[in-house]
């Protein structure tokens, strides 16, 4: 950085400290990733100066000829990646992408079927503290108490009983493959629209390593970060028949001007997804998650559903006598970043929880391999089993430091 250190030392120091934190800690938050330098350059470009209300060729401002090119590139690449008929890359977040779909097809008070938050769903899938649970009548489905897999019989029974206008699939903490075909069949049986929120698994879908929801769903929403490894933002994919309504729901419905610098970064990251090495990356994300799951299981640590099919693992801490709140703090103290997370049928409060969520997208971007993830699993077990033993915790810190030194992050950044 050339100008910021001299102009605003306080902000620069905060950025520099965050850069140091990312380098010296192991990032296992499942919703986080490390974007490329090219993505960061696009997001920090002069496009941040341009207002561009509307869509390419139909703007409310002049001087949009170059940002039109950028947005068209982003849309075309997303269509190619996922095989979608229509794409909107303007949502500022996944939550706003979901809101736009709801505003497109629902009226206040309409019934919607969505996944219970504590079973792995998302706030925008009907949580009573979120706009979705306030505006609409959400009925919850969940996972089987024994297998901890989605109970499709329960989904069907609730769909038949409540006749929802929309069924929502997708999750923020579900480690297993979702059967989109089964959901489509249930939606058709009750005459419901079908939406998939693939925010967590979009990169795996893009690589062909998880079933693609686009052929089955009326609407697919996603974030553009997480496993897709782009900038923080959202996107909607849908059938052409819904395209104009979706676009109107985003603008002028719930947003004003799009963030063109972020859309440029989305376009760059989509270009990266189309490269052959992205599939290798996504394969490594999954294999690393499986190695981490195996390492934790070997240490006697329980996992929700017994393992993972994707990038994330949900750890059940009850056998260790720990809460998620305590475990998150213990791991942070040794240099591993995670988040407390509810588990299915969790007896603890949402700010305490009985679990932690772990993900491998970020560490895989950093270069961690299967052996490294096996070591990470051993370190986690050492710390959690000995969370009051300062000697053991110091050993864990040293082992974390050895890994972060071995896999440096952003070697070319000058701060």
Curated annotation (Swiss-Prot):
* Protein's UniProt keywords contain Amino-acid biosynthesis: yes
EC id: 2.1.2.1
Pfam assignment, any one: SHMT
Where does this protein hold (6S)-5,6,7,8-tetrahydrofolate? Answer: 117, 121-123, 241
Q: Where is this site: Plays an important role in substrate specificity?
A: 225
Tell me the pathway.
Answer: One-carbon metabolism; tetrahydrofolate interconversion; Amino-acid biosynthesis; glycine biosynthesis; glycine from L-serine: step 1/1
Q: Name the catalysed reactions.
A: (6R)-5,10-methylene-5,6,7,8-tetrahydrofolate + glycine + H2O = (6S)-5,6,7,8-tetrahydrofolate + L-serine
What the record says about its domains? Folds into two domains, a large PLP-binding domain (residues 63-276) and a small C-terminal domain.
- UniProt subunit comment: Homodimer.
Name of this chain's protein: Serine hydroxymethyltransferase
Gene encoding this chain? glyA
